[in-house]
Amino acid sequence: MGLRGRSTWCEVACSRRNSAIPSDQRLLFGGDRVGSIILAIAAQHEFAAEVPLNPTPIALPVSIVFVALLILALSIRRIRSVGRLPHRKWRRVTEWLVLSLVTLVCAAATLTTTYNMIAQRYYQSIYKAPGKLYEVGGYRMHLYCTGEGSPTLVLEAGWTVPALGWGTVQPELSKTTKVCSYDRAGYGWSEPQPGPRDADQIATQLHALLQQAGVTGPIILMGHSMGGLYIRDYASHYPENLVGLIFVDAITPVQPGQLSPELRADLYEIPTYEYYIFSMTYGLGIPRVMGECSKVYAGFEEHTERMLAESVCNSLLGEIWKEYKGWWQSFDETIHTGPYGNLPILIFSRDPQKHSGAGAPSRLELEESVVWNQMQEDLKKFSTRNRRIIFRGSGHEIPLERADLLNKEVLVFVRQIRNEAPQPTDYGSTKTE
């Protein structure tokens, strides 16, 4: 999810920029409600299959354990010799205290990292993919299709979010038509793939995946946040059999001069050191030890055990980072996409009046809200058959915050494409519901 695009990477961990960042990025920290309930949603709908989650790379945690044990051994050895050193008492005591602290820290790091590795492997081995795996470019990709009927609704999630992020949407929509969600490379049950993670590459891989699975059309694409950028790219390269587009608070390419330097930095520029901090934090198992990987939220108490397998705490941060590094390339690839003639387009947007936090919105947050609202309005230029709906009271996470209204409007959209419902008489409109 991302402009809102900065994904939700920093909303929790970088609270100094908390006001303007969307929820995809919150998923990188296990404490966010969105990330924490993804596996609970999966459990609720009894997802099950034969394929375990991607194994989390062990190079980092193994390295942490090795270094911690080495320092631990050297510290203990030094502690044993401190009392025999010809130093003043205060110096010996100080050195002993410092070495003892180092020993405790290294011992704790070894224990938490080892515990985290074991927990990851255990939960990744017992929770299976809900859908099927298909080979795309020599690597396995996960596609989960439910329901029957035409057209097929293909779901593209936001940044950092696996297919299970559509858990509040897919079960309901699949009662009416065929619905397919999938894991991008390196997410969920899909294997990581070499090469860039920009819009062209992601759209190409999605098209190949659908071809492999025999999902050839007619197709409606629905993309949330950063996923909206990817379905634009797909529509430009593979318009055949495409019968509709649905943008769910979708990101649009940034136009030159559209953002102030301060807002641009706040939304799109993630310092590299933050990635390394996140990697080290997760490698040490700190979120798991603090309970962030097993938080129980109201309404999901019965799924506590399955929530322990939450994909956020087991995510491939390297793949997520690669996708972030491809943002500006993705903007360049999609800035001139469209228009799409009379292709039916539905645009869902968050409430511009909804701001994070209890206090008055900051100047930067107000600026972001104005720019974001205009970007949403600009999506109407893609087709003469467009409608925009602002979800009153909803933030960026529309599929979770207003799943009821989203499902209702999408089902009407599907029936209109089937010619089973009257065609809209308010094309070009923007309304709030």
Task: For every predicted segment, state its role.
Residues A199, A203, Y238-L242, I246-K381, ...:
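Flexible "cap/lid" subdomain of the alpha/beta-hydrolase fold that forms the substrate-access gate
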Residues Y144, R184-M222, Y238:
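Active-site loop/oxyanion-hole signature of alpha/beta-hydrolase fold enzymes
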Residues D233-H237:
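Active-site signature of alpha/beta-hydrolase-fold catalytic machinery across serine-
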Residues G223, G227, I231:
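Gly/Ala-rich beta-loop-alpha elbow adjacent to hydrolase catalytic centers
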Residues T384-E433:
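Catalytic active-site module of serine/aspartate enzymes centered on a nucleophile-bearing elbow/loop
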Residues Y139, C145-W189:
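Conserved HGGG/HGGXW glycine-rich cap/lid loop of the alpha/beta-hydrolase fold
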Residues E11, R16-P151, K175-T177, P196, ...:
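Alpha/beta-hydrolase fold catalytic core
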